[in-house]
C-alpha cells in the first residue's frame, strides 16, 4: 500500500513538469515589430547627455509610437555601458521584436543626425523633431526633471555624466519592482527606495525625474514585455561573480534584490511559515496533498534555473502553477502563522476566494500554542543539555505572554475568520498579486442576522480596507438600518403602552414579553474579529 502513496507523490512532481521537455515541432514563430534603438557612437559626455535628453522626451511624447518609446527605453537602460550597442546585441533575445541599432555620432537641435543622406533621412529627422515638439507642448513647457535647470545643463565632463546617468537609471530600475504586480499602488514603495538611495548619496537628487514622467515610464514597463526581458537579462548578468563591478552595476544589482521573486510572495511565505516552522499540524491528513504539491513546485523551481525568480515579470505561463490556489489548505495555515508571528506580514493582502478560515485559525493557534518550541537538531548542534533546553523553553513561554498585548491583537484582528482583510495599509500589497487559481472550494459567506448595535458602532469606517471591504461595509449599513428601524418600532410601542389604562398594563406587558422573547442570535460582526 505504501507504493501507491510514493507513486502519488511522484505523480505530483511529474504533473508539475508535464509538457516542458523537448522542442516545439510546429512553426510557433510570431510576428515581429521593428524597433529603432539610438546608441552613442563615442564616449563624448556631451553627446551622451543630449541623447539621454532626447530619449526622455520621446517617452513622454504623446505622438511617439509605442515602438519608438520602447527603443528610447533601451537607449536609457543601456546608457551606463561603455558600449551600449554591444550590450544590447549580446543580451537582447526577444522573438517579438527586430532591433535596429543606430549609432549616433552627433546631435542637431536635440535630435540624432542620420549618417545617410537623402530625402528619407530628412523626413525621419523632421518626424523626430515633431515628436520632441509635442512632448514639450503636452507638458506645457515643463521638463522631465523636477529641477528644470537639469534639462538645460550642458555636461562636458565624465564624472557629471556618470552621476546623471546613474540617477536616471536608478529611478527607472526602481519602477520595475511594482510595474507588473501593483502599478496603481507603487508610488509609496518607490518613494521609500528613492529616499534610501538619496540618503546613501548613491544618486544625485538634482536629476530627479517628475512624477508625470515616471508614470509614463511605469506604464511603458507594464505594457512592454520586451523592455522587461532586456532588464531581466541585465539583472542576471550583473549578479554573476567576477571582477570588481562599477558603481552603476552595483546599484542595479541592489535594486534587483527587490525585483527577485516579485509576485510569488504566497509561494515563498508558504514555505517559510508553513514548512520551515515545523509545527505538528503538518501531520494532518488534509495537508498531505498540498505538501506533495509544494514539494513538486520546489523541484520545478530549481529546474527552471536563474530565470525562476523573474517568471512573473517575464509573464511565463508556468507561473500559474505556483499560485496558492494549487495548495489552498497549506497556504491558509501558513498565512495564519505568518500574521501571528511576523509583524511585516500585517500588510499582505490575503483576501482570496480559496482562503480556508478553519486552517487559517489553526495556523494562528499553532503559532501561539507552540511558542517556545525547540528544534532538537539545532539544540544538539549547539550542545544544549536538557536543563538548558527546559530553561530556554520556559523563558520563551514567559516572554510569549507579552505577545498577547494590544499590538499583536490588533495585528491579528486585521484578518477576519472568513478571509476579509480588515484594517491595515496598502503598502506592498502588490507582492501577493500573482495569478490566481481557484481551488473549486466554495467561498465563505457571511451571516448577517441582526445583533448588538454597540458592536456595529464600534467598528470605524476607516478600519475597512479597500480590498474585500465592500461586503463588510454593506453588511454594517444594513445592520444599522435594521437596528434603527427596530429602535423606532420599540419607541412607538412604548409610547402606545404608556397610554393604556394601568389595570391593563401588567397583562399587556406579560403578553409582549412572551411574544417578543429575544432568541439567541449570532453576533453580526463575528467575522470582523480574529479568533484570538
UniProtKB/Swiss-Prot annotation:
Residue ranges of the region described as Ncore: 1-402
Biased composition range(s): Polar residues: 491-507
Positions of region (Disordered): 425-444, 449-471, 487-532
Biased amino acid composition, Low complexity: 451-471
Subcellular location, record wording: Virion; Host cytoplasm
Pfam family, one: Paramyxo_ncap
Oligomer and partners: Homomultimer; forms the nucleocapsid. Binds to the viral genomic RNA. N0 interacts with the phosphoprotein (via N-terminus); this interaction allows P to chaperon N0 to avoid N polymerization before encapsidation. Interacts as N-RNA template with the phosphoprotein (via C-terminus); this interaction positions the polymerase on the template.
Family classification: Belongs to the paramyxoviruses nucleocapsid family.
Known function: Forms the helical nucleocapsid (NC) in a ratio of 1 N per 6 ribonucleotides, protecting the genome from nucleases. The encapsidated genomic RNA serves as template for transcription and replication; encapsidation by N is coupled to RNA synthesis. Forms the encapsidation complex with the phosphoprotein protein P. Before encapsidation, the newly synthesized free N protein, so-called N0, is chaperoned by P.
Name of the molecule in the record: Nucleoprotein
